[in-house]
Swiss-Prot record:
PANTHER family assigned: PHOSPHO-N-ACETYLMURAMOYL-PENTAPEPTIDE-TRANSFERASE, PHOSPHO-N-ACETYLMURAMOYL-PENTAPEPTIDE-TRANSFERASE HOMOLOG
GO MF annotation: an example: metal ion binding
Entry's EC annotation: 2.7.8.13
Protein name: Phospho-N-acetylmuramoyl-pentapeptide-transferase
Organism of provenance: Agrobacterium fabrum (strain C58 / ATCC 33970)
GO biological process, one term: peptidoglycan biosynthetic process
Localisation per UniProt entry: Cell inner membrane
Upper taxonomic lineage: Bacteria, Pseudomonadati, Pseudomonadota, Alphaproteobacteria, Hyphomicrobiales
Length: 366
């Protein structure tokens, strides 16, 4: 919103700063963190009063989790408030990518909110119907991908088809044009990312830090991919307009830091599906916009690992009646093995940092 003040920069030199994405990304981070810090306590108290027993605790989960009974959920509302505030204030709302990513974030957040609401009111870990939830997620994601694809095709240099193509790391020229089938592929990436983060969110601080790490990584990628000079130097695909997504990433990091203040063990609040679905969808959307969907598998490798552990567990149990892991997602397996919660969380953070660095390395290895 404030970017429009650039038009007055000839009268007020200070407004010229709003021209720079890096400045606005930093300002968005500060703004979103401030919003969460200021309104977080009131939101937590309100949710605690309204929810009573808080988020239901799985009966088959680790014994250490029962002491968390009564902790309110839906903390994603705090995160969404920060992201929305920082993005609306400092982002370019005329940018199609910005609007599409925010649409996915809010849409997935609304789905997660309804899911959390059902779980809290029923005091059950069974919320929104799985098929209905996935169907709505795919619809929201497909609409966003369609508009991002159209934007990428319209702005592609020399009438290229990058917007409807899958790009691969290490090989700039190797792309596969899917045509309109790219909408389905992109929607799958976004929905997969949203639900992968959702599965990861099971311990205090476990999901939010890897989310910030992955978001920061894609913020760098978005900034570079949206800059013709940097994209040409690194031999990555140039996608005009995606640099503006770095501002949203700044808001994500700020909101994430603010939320972590309250989510650090012992957590005063859980983000719930409200936050995890929204954040995962946001990261997946940026990966699709910047044509780094495959790199998403590397950068978000922790989320992929958590998801695969559930898929393997369910598949093998249905097939043989036996379990591969003591409990899934895999972070619970390590708890059952005797790791403390802090050991699991910090070690998974370390894995996230390593995967993020590996993902960034793909930008240079061509």
């Amino acid at each position: 919103m404030l970017i429009w003040l650039v038009e007055l920069s000839d009268k007020v030199q200070l407004f010229n700063l709003f021209r720079y994405i890096t400045f606005r990304a930093g300002a968005a981070m500060f703004t979103s963190a401030l919003i969460v810090f200021l309104f977080g306590p009131a939101i937590i108290n309100s949710l605690r009063v309204r929810q009573g027993k808080g988020q239901p605790i799985r009966a088959d989960g680790p014994q250490t989790h029962f002491k968390k009974a009564g902790t309110p959920t839906m903390g994603g509302l705090m995160i969404l408030a920060g992201i929305l505030g920082g993005s609306l204030l400092w982002g370019d709302l005329s940018n199609v990518y910005v609007v599409a990513v925010l649409m996915v974030t809010l849409g997935f957040g609304a789905i997660g909110f309804y899911d959390d609401y059902l779980k809290v009111t029923k005091q059950s870990d069974k919320g929104f119907s799985g098929k209905a939830r996935l169907g709505i997620e795919f619809l929201i994601a497909a609409i966003a991908v369609f508009f991002m694809m159209k934007m990428a095709l319209a702005s592609a240099p020399h009438g290229g088809t990058l917007g409807s193509s899958i790009a691969f790391p290490f090989f700039k020229e190797f792309v596969i044009n899917l045509g309109y089938f790219f909408v389905l592929f992109g929607a799958f990436v976004i929905v997969g990312a949203g639900n992968a983060v959702n599965l990861t969110d099971g311990l205090d601080g476990l999901a939010i830090v890897p989310v910030m790490i992955a978001a920061a990584t894609f913020g760098v990628i978005a900034y570079l991919a949206g800059n013709a000079v940097f994209a040409n130097y690194l031999q990555i695909n140039f996608v005009p307009g995606t640099g503006e997504l770095a501002v949203i990433v700044g808001a994500v990091i700020g909101a994430g830091l603010g939320f972590l203040w309250f989510n650090a063990p012992p957590a005063a609040i859980f983000m719930g599906d409200t936050g995890s679905l929204a954040l995962g969808g946001l990261i997946g959307s940026i990966a699709v916009a910047t044509k780094h969907e495959i790199v998403m598998v590397i950068v978000g490798g922790l989320f992929v690992m958590e998801t695969l552990s559930v898929i393997i567990q369910v598949f093998w149990f249905k097939r043989t009646g036996r379990r591969v892991f003591l409990m899934a997602p895999i972070h619970h397996h390590f708890e059952k093995k005797g790791w403390t919660e802090s050991q699991v969380v910090i070690r998974f953070w370390i894995i996230s940092v390593g995967l993020a660095l590996l993902g960034l390395a793909t930008l240079k290895l061509r």
